[in-house]
Amino acid sequence: MATDSVYRVTEVIGVSSESWAQAARNAVETAAKSVRDLRVAEVVRQDVTIQEGAVVNFRVRLAMSFKYESGE
């Protein structure tokens, strides 16, 4: 029998000097250390930081969902 569930969505930004994929992994791995039961991460936005005409960081904004625990 299925039970009703509620999920919370929060946004995080991952940063990497290597790639957008690594930036996303960094965000998920870091969030997983303090948030239980992560379910889905959706890429909301990608951008880069630039210094002296060169890309120095890849940034990914993720909307991450996790199951809400009511405390009951």
PLM region descriptions:
Residues 1-3, 50-53:
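Short beta-strand/turn micro-motifs at beta-sheet edges
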Residues 7-9, 45, 57-63:
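Broad gene-expression machinery/nucleic-acid interaction feature
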Residues 41-50:
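Short, conserved loop-to-beta-strand elements that form functional interface hotspots
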Residues 53-72:
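C-terminal structural segments of small proteins and small subunits
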Residues 4-40:
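Short, well-ordered alpha-helical segments
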Residues 17-19, 48, 67-71:
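Generic "edge-of-domain/loop-turn" microfeature
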